[in-house]
């Protein structure tokens, strides 16, 4: 396929997909996936803990392998693709950013809650000092008005971001909402716009196409839909759809299909599908990585995981507040016991 691109895809299976396998990636798995992605001519490959650099912890989930080892492994086998990392200020620090840059990372995505772009300034500034491509990543974008989103995106642009993303962390946005947000950003910013979707309402592809139609040129995908919740926009399908539309990605479709079937599918612990819990994530507007945490808490306290997720949505809990899952599960169990005792 031509190396010319209308759409630049970032493959997130080695970062967002980490959530789906409880952060258990091995060096061997990362090498095999990254090498195949590079051979398929995917331009960007994101590698890090599911919650970004330094995410390995009791709160977010312990990594099987140190993420710096995984980053080094991916860099070592990629001849064309650029390795990217995710960094959430407050979890990852400048120290981790510097360490990743030393290991050959070329792009960092600085992720904040959609209303907290101001905390990205230091990290975006440092990324540019290191010569990295800096991306502003506005998570849980469904939780802010379009006007607020534009305001926050402008802040990231002012700090030096090369790209700003609308990030549908909960898979809660509907296509017309994506259209409105991307259109407003395109009219208000002078930098590229990106979109990151989740498939909890079976709308990842529709939302991605809506974003592209309004001018988004940076798009996230996950091979075999390997990501938090019900996964992300499925990369190999996205490449096929965009080819049908006539938009160039530069990605080899057959190689992506083979990678999905032969390398990634065996890594999946269970098939990526829209389960009742992932559906509730999109319905209630809850951070997609909360699904497995909620399932474990539900089992521990003998309650329905859906009740936990719905309550999380009501309280507008955001990424970084995983400890609330246990608190809410305990509250529901306590109320259940009290009701049963009457």
UniProtKB/Swiss-Prot annotation:
Domain Pyruvate carboxyltransferase: 7-257
Active-site residues, as the UniProt record annotates them: 19
GO MF term set: 2-isopropylmalate synthase activity; 4-hydroxy-2-oxovalerate aldolase activity; manganese ion binding
CDD domains hit by this protein: DRE_TIM_HOA
SUPFAM superfamilies, A to Z: Aldolase (SSF51569), post-HMGL domain-like (SSF89000)
One Pfam short name: DmpG_comm
Reaction it catalyzes: (S)-4-hydroxy-2-oxopentanoate = acetaldehyde + pyruvate
Highest taxon listed in the record's lineage: Bacteria
EC number: 4.1.3.39
Residues annotated to bind Mn(2+): 16, 196, 198
Residues that coordinate or bind substrate: 15-16, 169, 196, 287
Keyword Lyase appears in the UniProt entry: yes
Transmembrane segments: none
Keywords annotated in UniProt: Aromatic hydrocarbons catabolism, Lyase, Manganese, Metal-binding
UniProt site positions, description: Transition state stabilizer: 15
InterPro entries xrefs: 2-IPM_HCS-like (IPR050073), 4OH_2_O-val_aldolase (IPR017629), Aldolase_TIM (IPR013785), DmpG_comm (IPR012425), DRE_TIM_HOA (IPR035685), PYR_CT (IPR000891)
Any one biological process term the GO annotation gives: catabolic process
Family indicated by similarity: Belongs to the 4-hydroxy-2-oxovalerate aldolase family.
Annotated protein name in UniProt: 4-hydroxy-2-oxovalerate aldolase
Species this protein is from: Geobacillus thermodenitrificans (strain NG80-2)
Lineage, uppermost ranks: Bacteria, Bacillati, Bacillota, Bacilli, Bacillales
């Amino acid at each position: 396929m031509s190396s010319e691109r209308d759409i630049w895809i970032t493959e997130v299976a080695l970062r967002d997909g980490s959530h789906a396998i409880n952060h258990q990636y091995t060096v061997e798995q990362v090498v095999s996936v990254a090498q195949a992605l590079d051979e398929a001519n995917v331009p960007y490959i994101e590698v890090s803990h599911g919650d970004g650099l330094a995410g390995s912890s009791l709160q977010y989930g312990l990594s099987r392998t140190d993420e710096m080892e995984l980053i080094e492994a991916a860099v070592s086998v990629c001849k064309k693709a650029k390795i990217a990392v995710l960094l959430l200020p407050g979890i990852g620090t400048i120290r981790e950013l510097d360490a990743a840059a030393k290991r050959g990372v070329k792009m960092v995505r600085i992720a904040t809650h959609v209303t907290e772009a101001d905390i990205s300034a230091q990290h975006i500034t440092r990324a540019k000092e290191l010569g990295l491509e800096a991306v502003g990543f506005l998570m849980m974008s469904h939780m802010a008005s379009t006007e607020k989103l534009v305001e926050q995106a402008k802040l990231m642009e002012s700090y030096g971001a090369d790209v700003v993303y609308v990030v549908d962390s909960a898979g809660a946005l509907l296509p017309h909402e994506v259209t409105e947000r991307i259109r407003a950003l395109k009219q208000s910013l002078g930098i590229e716009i990106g979109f990151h979707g989740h498939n909890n309402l079976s709308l990842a592809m529709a939302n991605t196409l809506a974003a592209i139609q309004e001018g988004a040129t940076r798009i996230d995908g996950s091979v075999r839909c390997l990501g938090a919740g019900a996964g992300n926009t499925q990369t190999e399908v996205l490449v096929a759809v965009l080819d049908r539309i006539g938009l160039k990605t530069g990605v080899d479709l057959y190689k992506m299909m083979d990678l999905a079937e032969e390398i990634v599918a065996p890594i999946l612990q269970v098939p990526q599908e829209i389960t009742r819990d992932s559906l509730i994530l999109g319905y209630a507007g809850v951070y997609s990585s909360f699904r497995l945490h909620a399932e474990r808490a539900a089992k521990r306290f003998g309650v329905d995981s859906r009740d936990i997720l719905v309550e999380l949505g009501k309280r507008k809990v955001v990424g970084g507040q995983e400890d609330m899952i246990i608190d809410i599960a305990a509250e529901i169990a306590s109320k259940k016991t009290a009701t049963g005792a009457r």
